[in-house]
From Swiss-Prot:
Its main location: nucleus. This is Hairy/enhancer-of-split related with YRPW motif protein 1. Belongs to the HEY family. It is found in: Nucleus. It comes from Danio rerio (Zebrafish). The gene is hey1. It comes from the Eukaryota. Residues 30-47 have a biased composition (Polar residues).
């Protein structure tokens, strides 16, 4: 009896082998029969089995092609090369094996952390959007690879994607820990500002201890106007003075009254600010405010224009 050697890997492989063996047996029986030919019903069954085999084989090939397309989209190295040239199936499988080896060598680091996994998929999505943007510029807008606008835009997006990938390895902080420290740090200065306005009508330093706010208004000294730390060139006024007093840029303040700079911020604030660099929005959209500018405006009529750095950043949102 003729044996079947079909090496199909479909789900219904066993049924297909059984059907082929029956078909071969029917053919052999028909050849050895005295009539020497098969009946019409047997011929129709054989043709139906052949058609069914073709459908099963087509489904198997479609499933393989769909899986290869998913691998080409998910593997970073294969995804970056899909726009330049058509990848063969062997190349896609090889890149997948290399990617899995790299993950195995790294011990699966990052793929057990939900935040790191989301950041990884975000990078893949950004790369996919970058490829779609380049395709749109070339097909719809008609910009070739030598166009300066296309070169500038694509290089900017590539550099941004590289920075995102570099910043994703700084530390996996949640959104709450990244934004938890600055509000508490600023709330301390707001509390001091409220105590200052309730205790004395004169402007006082927010960096001074709260015990200095309990002094009477009549004990103000000539150095009282300079106790309010502001940025250089801003107005420092007092309720009893008739004209504003400006601090030149070269004026040196006492060590305890220096304006807050990025190098003298508290370590938790610096840590939270450094963690913010891993997120998409720039820090320039949120300028550091001086503590004295966070309180409500004083009723003095000699105050200059209020310090509002956010008015220049409204367009960023």
């Amino acid at each position: 009896m003729k044996r079947n050697h079909d090496f199909s890997s479909s789900d219904s492989e066993l049924d297909e082998n059984i059907e082929v063996e029956k078909e071969s047996a029917d053919e052999n029986a028909g050849a050895n029969s005295p009539l020497g030919s098969m009946s019409p019903s047997t011929t129709s069954q054989v043709q139906a089995r052949k058609r069914r085999r073709g459908i099963i084989e087509k489904r198997r090939r479609d499933r393989i092609n769909n899986s290869l397309s998913e691998l080409r989209r998910l593997v970073p190295s294969a995804f970056e090369k899909q726009g330049s040239a058509k990848l063969e199936k062997a190349e896609i499988l090889q890149m997948t094996v290399d990617h899995l080896k790299m993950l195995h060598a790294a011990g699966g680091k990052g793929y057990f952390d939900a935040h790191a996994l989301a950041m990884d998929y975000r990078g893949l999505g950004f790369r996919e959007c970058l490829a779609e943007t380049a395709r749109y510029l070339s097909i719809i807008e008609g910009l070739d690879n030598t166009d300066p606008l296309r070169i500038r835009l694509v290089s900017h997006l590539n550099s941004y994607a590289s920075q995102r990938e570099a910043h994703s390895g700084l530390g996996h902080l949640a959104w709450g820990s990244a934004f938890g420290t600055p509000p508490s740090h600023l709330a301390h200065h707001l509390l001091l500002q409220q105590q200052q306005q309730q205790g004395a009508p004169l402007a006082r330093s927010t960096s001074s201890p709260p015990s200095s706010n309990s002094s009477s208004p009549s004990s103000s000294s000539p150095s009282a106007p300079s106790t309010e730390p502001r940025l250089s060139g801003t107005v420092i006024s007092e309720a009893g003075q008739t004209g504003p007093l400006r601090v030149p840029p070269s004026t040196s303040l006492p060590p305890g009254l220096t304006p807050p700079t990025a190098s003298k911020l508290s370590p938790p604030l610096l840590t939270s600010l450094s963690s913010l660099s891993a997120f998409p929005f720039p820090l320039s959209a949120f300028p550091l405010l001086s503590p004295s500018s966070l309180g409500p405006a004083t009723p003095s009529s000699s105050l200059g224009k209020p310090y509002r750095p956010w008015s220049m950043e409204i367009g960023a949102f």
